[in-house]
C-alpha cells in the first residue's frame, strides 16, 4: 500500500565528472520491511545509503520521506526525521563505555549533551534512551564495559544500538556483518529479524545467504544502474542476476544435487 512507503527515491543520480556512481534510481522503501541492496563493489550501494542519510547530495533526482522532499535538507535534519545510519567500518568510541557510546548518539535526539553541566532531566532522558538501545541489541549486560574490550561482533551490535538510540523509524545499515564469523553473523541476523518488525531497514550486505534470509524486498545494482527489485525468489530467478552475481556457483550446486 502507498501509505506504507516511508522513504522513496525518484530518478536519483550521483555523478563525479564523467563517473556515474548512481544513475536514475527510483526505489520505494516500506515500513516494517527489510529491503536488501546488493551488487558488486562499485555498484553504488554505499553511495545510495550516503544520499538516503543526507551526507551526500544527489546530482539530480529527489528523495522523499513520508511524501515530503528531504534531499535538500542538512544531514542533522535527516536524523531528526528518524533516519539512522551505520557504516561499513566500525564507527564507535572505543575509549568509553557502551552506555556512553549510545548516550553520545542519543543526545542528537534530544538536542542536548550527556555531561555534568546538562540538566538532570536531560541526562536522565539520554541515559534511558541509551539503556533501552543497548537492551534492544542484547547488550544490557555490557552497559559499563569499555567498548574496546568487547568482541568485534559485539562492537557491531553496539553500532546498531547507537543508531537505535537516535529513535529512528528507518535504519540504513552498511554491511553490519562484514568481517564476522558464522556465529556472530547469526546473532546479527536474529537481531535484524526482530528489529524489522518495528522499523524500515535498508540493508547493504555482501553475505548473500544472510540477505536472502532477511529481505522482504531485494534490489540489485550494477555499475550504478538499477537491475531489478523484487522478492528474493524473483531476484534469484532473474537470468541477469544469475549471470552477473549468483552465476555458475548456484548452477553447479543445482547440478551436483540432481
Briefly describe each language-model feature range.
Residues 2-258:
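Glycine-rich phosphate-binding loops of nucleotide-dependent enzymes
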Amino acid at each position: 500500500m502507498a501509505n506504507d512507503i516511508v522513504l522513496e527515491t525518484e530518478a536519483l543520480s550521483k555523478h563525479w565528472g564523467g563517473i556515474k556512481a548512481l544513475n536514475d534510481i527510483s526505489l520505494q522503501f516500506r515500513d516494517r520491511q527489510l529491503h536488501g541492496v546488493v551488487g558488486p563493489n562499485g555498484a553504488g550501494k554505499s553511495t545510495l545509503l550516503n544520499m538516503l542519510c543526507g551526507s551526500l547530495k544527489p546530482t539530480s533526482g529527489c528523495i522523499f520521506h513520508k511524501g515530503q522532499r528531504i534531499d535538500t535538507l542538512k544531514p542533522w535534519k535527516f536524523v531528526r526525521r528518524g533516519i539512522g545510519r551505520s557504516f561499513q567500518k566500525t564507527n564507535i568510541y572505543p575509549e568509553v563505555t557502551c552506555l556512553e557510546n549510545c548516550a553520545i548518539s542519543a543526545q542528537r535526539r534530544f538536542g542536548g549533551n550527556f555531561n555534568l553541566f546538562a540538566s538532570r532531566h536531560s541526562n536522565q532522558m539520554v541515559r534511558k534512551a541509551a539503556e533501552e538501545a543497548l537492551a534492544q541489541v542484547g547488550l544490557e549486560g555490557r552497559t559499563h564495559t569499555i567498548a574496546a574490550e568487547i568482541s568485534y561482533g559485539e562492537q557491531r551490535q553496539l553500532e546498531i544500538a547507537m543508531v537505535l538510540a537516535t529513535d529512528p523509524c528507518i535504519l540504513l545499515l552498511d554491511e553490519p556483518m562484514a568481517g564476522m564469523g558464522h556465529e556472530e553473523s547469526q546473532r546479527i541476523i536474529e537481531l535484524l529479524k526482530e528489529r524489522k518488525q518495528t522499523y524500515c531497514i535498508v540493508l547493504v550486505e555482501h553475505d548473500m545467504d544472510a540477505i536472502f534470509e532477511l529481505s522482504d524486498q531485494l534490489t540489485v545494482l550494477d555499475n550504478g544502474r538499477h537491475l531489478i527489485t523484487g522478492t528474493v525468489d524473483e531476484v534469484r530467478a532473474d537470468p541477469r542476476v544469475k549471470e552477473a552475481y549468483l552465476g555458475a556457483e548456484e548452477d553447479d550446486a543445482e547440478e551436483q544435487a540432481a
